[in-house]
Regions:
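Glycine-rich anion-binding loops and their surrounding alpha/beta cores
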Residues: 1-180
Length: 180
């Protein structure tokens, strides 16, 4: 949770086991009032609604997105619809995974252990599918930050960086520093 009031809501949300209005409010109540943000929403109508709310706020750029297959991340298997909010204006665009690679089902984990293994394989570059999944999402973040408007260029840079194992080396370095 970002907003202090959300800490009281979090346990109830978890007990309910289904999305509530607080799932939509969370990203909008960030007290850091970040100028750039990407917000994934698993429902297209809600994504468009959130984009309209964000357009009323004073943010440099926010991209709200939802995949047509119901994920709150850029999908590796279906079109992702994005609402690019800049200076109160909303521009809609789509990301088609087929423009980057042969589409494949979004990787998932069935346990914390599987998630940890997938994370490690991603950061050390040994699992091409999870690397592509993360790289495609990073490409959107890079676009939001203005690094490049070209998603393909951003994807290639992110994919190359993740595949290199540099992220894994950096994480090991931090872990070793914490243990010393």
């Amino acid at each position: 949770y970002f907003h202090p009031a959300m800490k009281n809501v979090a346990p109830v949300r978890k007990q309910l086991g289904f999305p509530t209005v607080f799932n939509m409010l969370g990203p909008l109540l960030n007290p850091a009032d970040v100028p750039y943000q990407i917000i994934g929403v698993p429902n297209l109508k809600k994504a468009e609604f959130i984009a309209k709310v964000v357009a009323l706020k004073d943010r440099k750029r926010v991209i709200v997105y939802s995949s047509k297959d119901g994920y709150d991340e850029v999908s590796t298997n279906d079109i992702t619809v994005c609402f690019d909010v800049k200076s109160g204006e909303i521009e809609k665009f789509e990301i088609n995974p087929a423009d980057f690679f042969e589409p494949f089902p979004v990787p998932s984990a069935n346990s914390p252990e599987e998630a940890e293994l997938a994370f490690m394989r991603t950061v050390n570059g040994s699992d091409p599918l999870t690397v592509k999944t993360v790289a495609l999402n990073v490409a959107l973040a890079m676009k939001c930050l203005g690094i490049s408007e070209n998603l393909k260029e951003n994807f290639e840079k992110a994919n190359e960086f993740l595949s290199s194992g540099k992220v894994y080396s950096f994480i090991k370095e931090i872990a070793n520093a914490d243990n010393s």
